[in-house]
Amino acid sequence: MALISIALLAPSHLSGQSGGDRLILFGDVVYFYPPGHARNCLLNNQFKRGEPVGFRMNAINPATGKRDRATELVVHLNFAGKTIDLPMRDRQNERQPEREFWVAKWIVPDDAPMGIVRYTVTAKDPQGRTGEFKPFEVQASQITIVP
């Protein structure tokens, strides 16, 4: 019984996220080829120059367990000594109401150096709550530019 009480009182963390009033962010990285392409939306972390990297994320209000479509999400890519900010867009629409997430696309530049591309995603909702997603610090799971 004591172990159950301790587990219930311990803070909960989701992929490095803190509780309270901070937004909870989660998502994945995929190929973002056009619809109908065999590799479109296929989970991946190794990309070649010229390939489309897709970021799919969600931001949840911990108090309600729901997302606010007006929340703004931004992918922050760090590579080749610079940071690129990619605003995300809400993917949900009338024809596809089940797509309750945000997306951003980045084409790997032709001059991108081989190796790991670090990224984070930040979010801010209309009420001022914020959140941040950082992938696990495991090199094999990072976005990697390959030959």
Descriptions of predicted regions:
Residues 59, 106-108, 123:
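Hydrophobic beta-strand positions in extracellular immunoglobulin-like domains
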Residues 63, 126-130:
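Short, solvent-exposed loop/turn segments at the edges of extracellular beta-sandwich modules
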Residues 1-10:
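Bacterial N-terminal signal peptides
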Residues 129-147:
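Short beta-strand elements
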Residues 59-87:
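Short flexible loop/turn segments that cap and initiate beta-strands
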Residues 14-54, 59-62, 143-147:
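Short, compositionally biased P/S/T/A/G/V-rich stretches that sit at domain boundaries
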Residues 50-52, 114-118:
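Extracellular Ig-like/FN3 beta-sandwich strand-entry sites
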Residues 94-106, 113-115:
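Aromatic sugar-binding surface patches on proteins
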